[in-house]
């Protein structure tokens, strides 16, 4: 499977620990099938600088992976990133991460689908077309293992389906 350039979108303050777990999958064994963006480098900049960074980073990526936590769907930058990925014809996939533990060992509640509020050019909700993957497991280590197993295929599927929405 080819190595894909992936843009990870997530609610930074509540889910950065969970996001780091997913972003680092495969890096220890050096067999990751994706590489990601570095949100930490820009998060304290102006809105204009953040928009420019998102557009620049998105141009280098073939897919956006939205890591869906309890409040992800309410975050303006997540919505902006999804809209930009849609405008640019990128693959789009969501993965629920509420079952992964945070830095304190806590899981969170399942959040709303962030694709529901994005409307396509033909007036439909993006949520009608984009996969929002939920592992179905409740134990963090099983959630992690399931995401690790399915993430490469979810990315490939999103890229293959990008022209369908």
Placement of each model-derived feature along the sequence:
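Conserved beta-strand-loop-alpha-helix hinge of the TIR/SEFIR fold
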Residues: 57-87, 91-101
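Short, glycine/charged-enriched secondary-structure capping and boundary segments
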Residues: 21-24, 79-82, 107-110
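Conserved N-terminal substructure of TIR/SEFIR domains
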Residues: 1-60, 150-165
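A broadly tuned preference for mixed-charge, low-complexity surface segments
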Residues: 50-66, 116-126
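Glycine-rich loops and low-complexity Gly/Arg-rich segments
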Residues: 30-35, 58-60, 89-93, 117-121
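C-terminal interaction surface of TIR/SEFIR-family domains
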Residues: 5-7, 18, 103-165
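Conserved beta-strand termini and adjacent loop/short-helix elements that scaffold enzyme active sites
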Residues: 35-37, 95, 129
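Low-complexity, flexible helical/coil segments
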Residues: 40-47, 68-72, 99-105, 128-134
């Amino acid at each position: 499977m080819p190595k894909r350039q992936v843009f990870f979108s997530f609610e930074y303050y509540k889910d950065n620990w969970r996001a780091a777990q997913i972003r680092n999958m495969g890096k220890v064994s050096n067999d990751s099938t994706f590489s990601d963006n570095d949100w930490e480098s820009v998060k304290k900049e102006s809105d204009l600088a953040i928009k420019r960074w998102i557009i620049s980073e998105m141009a280098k990526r073939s897919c956006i992976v939205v890591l869906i936590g309890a409040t992800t769907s309410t975050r303006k930058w997540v919505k902006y990133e999804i809209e930009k990925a849609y405008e640019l014809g990128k693959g789009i996939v969501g993965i629920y991460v509420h079952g992964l533990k945070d830095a304190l060992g806590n899981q969170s509640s399942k959040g709303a689908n962030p694709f529901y509020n994005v409307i396509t050019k033909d007036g439909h909700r993006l949520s009608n077309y984009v996969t929002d993957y939920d592992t179905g497991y409740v134990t963090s280590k099983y959630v992690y293992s399931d995401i690790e197993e399915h993430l490469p295929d979810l990315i490939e599927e999103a890229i293959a389906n990008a022209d369908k929405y």
